[in-house]
Amino acid sequence: MKKNPLVAAMLLLVTGGCFAADLPDPTRTPGAINPGVTQANVSATICVKGWTRTVRPPMYYTNRLKKLQIRQYGYADTNPRNYEEDHLIPLSLGGNPTDPRNLWPEPRRSAWNADRKDELEFALYMGVCHGEVGLDEARRAFAMNWIEAYKRYGALLQRYRYGSVTEGRGGDSSNE
């Protein structure tokens, strides 16, 4: 039997839930915030160097959750090494560290992978800490569609290159 590539592509579009996606399922991962982080206290919380290390959950927690969520998402590729258990609203922007609604298995092998999201996380984090972007605006950008936000915040991405800027007021190299 001859296979039709168009039919295969259509099947992929229709069955969507079987393969890893660049954006999380909004019903499973809508995002959740850390109520202890507000616009009024960013200079004492997220903008303090190393702050994310103080709230990051232990690896045993995120590794266990990643395996569970890979099954819940119905990904065809079930190898945990091919995913980063990532916070939709980054810790560096006051995302909730342990709420499963803020974590999802983000594919590593994609044009819009965890590395690209990290670039946006850093740029918006720096924008918030330098007063160029409001905290709620930055959080919404991730919760709504981080890929569209990546395209929209080009100027910040140029100004605050991940890994090439001295982080100054806060954060840490893992910034997420």
Regions found by a protein language model. Give the residues of each.
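Nuclease and nuclease-like effector domains acting on nucleic acids or nucleotide cofactors
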Residues: K2-P5, M10-Y83, S92-E176
